[in-house]
């Protein structure tokens, strides 16, 4: 949750300039009535044509609209006060509030005299499009640009706000209301205490929101109680005892918006199931106090992708200022294919409240020039899986000249409740020399480190220059090619094979079925399959509380071992993949290889309904006798296409009576 947030608190968290041209015949399944509004019109006219247009907002507000109706404002026209139309549409026949003619978007100016310049209240199937909206006034009264709200209404279907320009929403300039999620540019709320109220198919797309004294785009609900999170902030417009059990909105899409110059949070989605936050540009948020560019809370299965977030302001070591935040009571968040840069507070934060977790998978993102804490992990941050990201953190002027620089971190754990955090397959350039202030809850596996400290816990660390094409020079999310590995890069085909990895990299290149490149960009395209792990069986059985599945689970840290007695040869390890793949080589990863590593082997592939030997007399030589992961690769004489591989183990080091394998991967 975000209010005036600190990490240590128990906390809950290009738009077309011209007017939309109207084509009613193509827009509706059922044709309604189209009403026209012109500043030079007359409220005594019928409003049914541009030449007989209505004049005022009051006339529009007095009309009860029906499914398929449209109210169109003349391009270039200006109106003062509040636009609050009445009536609801129907599925396939929404009520549309929009524009006609050519020129600038019609402007609705609340003038600071109304709570919201545009208000949609207890209505469904309504589309607001192509308007310019502003609401600026003096004093500390909270104000909103476009407000969608419902109370004790039940499901609210198919609300859309699209192609608007909302700007200069000025309420409180300091204090709680300047960080109030019920105030901002576009605000959607679900309230009440008797009838669970929530949105279905809520769409906020292709809007520009600028210069808001509180939030940019936010959805929130008083139907939010779960997992020990019982209320939002005391300054929210909910009476004492007014919060109710979690009832999430569904089908929420926040996409293609340009949000910038915002006092608090840029885009926030709360109390939602399966929300999508994608293709947004967010810049210069948290300008008045600690907050985050994009964050979500009380939300499950949220997908945050293809966003560019920058310029979030720094407010101190323990305050927010990150690009992205998985906040209070969130399960199974997915953050992928984003570009985070120049966020003074860092790239990502996870923090919750009550007993609920903040869960997230963070994959195939690029962070360039972020500061403070690149990854911040606080209360109840759990099941955080960070893999195949490229983190490029040079010594920027912001870091070099900041008086708090000594406290900056690459990874920072704030709370003992943090658990099950892993970093795998990442490229981390740490020219700023930021520290790793983590805990036993954080693991590292097969990351590439260039400059700065290296976590001692990464037993498979690769410490070298990643040899990328032109790193640190990206100018936008469409310009990430500088992070592509060169042909000589040690990152190529060096990664763990992680199941269900999404099938593509940060720029859409299909991933291989076997070992990927490290970092966010894949040099050579693969088959692009998003597959589960193979089924693994071992003829020797299991020892030391291990299971064969660990051999191909995408983690060096979870090895398989045979029993420590009775080992004879030959023995087999079989991998059955979800589908055929092309295999040109096999890599083995092992710890304490001189004591328990496989020495000689054959490789068989399942072809034409039988096992065929494709490599005879393969040999692995291990030199390490420690917990450091060693990796040895064998190339096949010729590539094979198969859905099953069998490793026939002919001999092994048996110092302790067993053999062990950390990971087997294909190339």
Regions found by a protein language model. Name each.
Residues 54, 72-73, 88-141, 168-178, ...:
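Right-handed parallel beta-helix/beta-spiral solenoid domain characteristic of secreted/periplasmic
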Residues 81, 135-137, 141, 164, ...:
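Surface-exposed loop/turn segments connecting beta-strands in extracellular beta-rich domains
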Residues 81-86, 92, 114, 337-340, ...:
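Predominantly extracellular beta-rich ligand-binding scaffolds that present long acidic/polar faces
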Residues 84, 111-119, 140-152, 174-199, ...:
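Extracellular beta-strand/beta-solenoid scaffold signature
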Residues 459-524:
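C-terminal accessory segments
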Residues 553-615, 619, 628-667:
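Aromatic, loop-rich ligand-recognition surfaces of beta-strand-rich domains
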């Amino acid at each position: 949750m975000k209010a005036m947030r600190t990490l240590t608190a128990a906390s809950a968290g290009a738009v077309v300039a011209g007017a939309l041209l109207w084509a009613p015949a193509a827009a509706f399944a059922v044709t309604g009535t189209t009403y026209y509004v012109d500043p030079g019109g007359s409220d005594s006219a019928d409003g049914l044509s541009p030449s007989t247009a209505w004049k005022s907002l009051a006339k529009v507000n007095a009309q009860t609209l029906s499914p398929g109706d449209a109210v169109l404002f003349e391009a270039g026209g200006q109106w003062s006060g509040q636009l609050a139309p009445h009536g609801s549409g129907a599925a396939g026949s929404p009520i549309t509030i929009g524009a006609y003619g050519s020129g600038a978007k019609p402007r609705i100016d609340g003038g600071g005299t109304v709570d919201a310049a545009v208000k949609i209240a207890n209505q469904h199937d309504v589309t607001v499009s192509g308007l310019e909206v502003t609401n600026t006034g003096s004093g500390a009264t909270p104000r909103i640009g476009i407000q969608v709200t419902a109370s004790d209404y039940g499901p609210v279907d198919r609300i859309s706000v699209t192609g608007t320009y909302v700007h200069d929403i000025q309420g409180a300039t300091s204090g709680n209301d300047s960080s109030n999620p019920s105030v901002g540019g576009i605000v959607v709320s679900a309230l009440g205490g008797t009838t669970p109220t929530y949105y279905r198919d809520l769409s906020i797309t292709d809007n520009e929101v600028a210069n808001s004294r509180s939030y940019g785009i936010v959805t929130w609900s008083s139907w939010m109680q779960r997992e020990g999170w019982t209320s939002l902030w005391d300054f929210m417009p909910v009476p004492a005892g007014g919060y109710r059990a979690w009832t999430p909105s569904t089908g929420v899409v926040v996409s293609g918006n340009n949000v910038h110059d915002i006092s608090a949070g840029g885009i926030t989605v709360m109390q939602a199931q399966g929300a999508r936050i994608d293709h947004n540009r967010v810049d210069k948020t948290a300008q008045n106090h600690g907050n985050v560019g994009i964050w979500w809370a009380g939300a499950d299965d949220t997908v945050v992708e293809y966003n560019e977030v920058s310029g979030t302001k720094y407010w101190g070591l323990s305050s927010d200022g990150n690009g992205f935040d998985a906040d209070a009571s969130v399960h199974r968040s997915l953050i992928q294919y984003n570009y985070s840069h120049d966020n003074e507070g860092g790239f990502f934060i996870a923090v919750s409240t009550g007993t609920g977790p903040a869960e997230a998978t963070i994959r195939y993102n690029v962070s360039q020039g972020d500061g403070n804490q690149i990854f911040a992990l606080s209360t109840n941050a759990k099941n955080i899986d960070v893999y195949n990201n490229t983190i490029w953190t040079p010594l920027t002027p912001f870091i070099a000249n900041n008086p708090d620089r000594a406290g900056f971190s690459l990874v920072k754990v704030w709370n003992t409740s943090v658990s099950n955090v892993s970093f795998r397959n990442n490229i981390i350039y740490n020219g700023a020399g930021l520290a790793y202030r983590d805990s036993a809850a954080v693991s590292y596996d097969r990351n590439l480190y260039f400059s700065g400290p290296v976590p001692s816990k990464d037993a498979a660390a690769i410490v070298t220059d990643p040899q990328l094409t032109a790193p640190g020079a990206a100018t936008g999310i469409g310009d990430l090619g500088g992070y592509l590995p060169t042909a000589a890069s040690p990152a190529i085909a060096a990664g763990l094979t992680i199941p269900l990895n999404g099938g593509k990299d940060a720029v859409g290149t299909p991933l291989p079925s076997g070992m990927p490149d490290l970092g966010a960009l894949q040099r050579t395209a693969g088959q692009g399959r998003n597959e589960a792990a193979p089924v693994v069986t071992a003829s020797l059985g299991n020892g030391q509380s291990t299971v064969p599945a660990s051999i191909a689970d995408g983690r060096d840290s979870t090895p398989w071992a045979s029993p420590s007695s009775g080992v004879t040869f030959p023995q087999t390890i079989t991998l059955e993949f979800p589908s055929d793949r092309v295999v040109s080589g096999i890599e083995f990863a092992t710890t304490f290889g001189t004591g328990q590593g496989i020495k000689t082997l054959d490789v068989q592939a399942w072809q034409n309904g039988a096992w065929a030997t494709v490599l005879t007399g393969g040999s692995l030589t291990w030199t390490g006798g420690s917990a450091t992961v060693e990796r040895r690769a064998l190339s096949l004489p010729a590539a094979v296409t198969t859905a099953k591989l069998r490793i026939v183990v002919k001999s092994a080091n048996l110092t302790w009576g067993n053999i062990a394998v950390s990971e087997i991967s294909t190339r």
